[in-house]
Curated annotation (Swiss-Prot):
<feature type="domain" description="CBS 1">
    <location>
        <begin position="9"/>
        <end position="66"/>
    </location>
</feature>
<dbReference type="InterPro" id="IPR000644">
    <property type="entry name" value="CBS_dom"/>
</dbReference>
<dbReference type="Pfam" id="PF00571">
    <property type="entry name" value="CBS"/>
</dbReference>
<keyword id="KW-0129">CBS domain</keyword>
<keyword id="KW-0677">Repeat</keyword>
<protein>
    <recommendedName>
        <fullName>Uncharacterized 17.7 kDa protein in bps2 3'region</fullName>
    </recommendedName>
</protein>
<dbReference type="InterPro" id="IPR046342">
    <property type="entry name" value="CBS_dom_sf"/>
</dbReference>
<dbReference type="InterPro" id="IPR051257">
    <property type="entry name" value="Diverse_CBS-Domain"/>
</dbReference>
<feature type="domain" description="CBS 2">
    <location>
        <begin position="72"/>
        <end position="128"/>
    </location>
</feature>
Amino acid sequence: MATKVSQIATTKVYVVKPNVTIAEAAKEMKEHNLGSLVVIDSQNRVVGIITERDIVKAASNRDIDSPVEKYMTKDVKGVTEDTEVTDALDIMLNNGFRHLPIIKSNGKLYGIVSIRDLARALLDVHTMQFGKPAEEVKGTGVICPVCGMEIDEYGYCGCGTGSG
């Protein structure tokens, strides 16, 4: 049975409203060591996501007092709770995302997964399939399930997750 994103999701998601300033969002992200914040409306529906990249763009424009809605990604490509981990990873890799909201059918937030969460889940599958973690199969011709490259003699692969 394939792993679903709901099985590995972070369900305690930090959110902001669209009118919060970039400076306030950056402070929240720093305080909680986050790479993104999900933006929700007054009905708690997902309307966007603000990421570190967006914060850097605003800062480089010297525009940190603007609301996050000016810089957030508005067309959020979220997934549903029953999306398989491999499908979520495919969406993230094809779109350059590092975070992917999990959105319920009513438009409200269920949770979030990061590229790191997905890589860990796939490495767990790797361990189940081969009986050993990636660092124990380094240099043996074993392929990383995330990037498809061989895990080298140092325990690394092309995407850096093969080291476990």
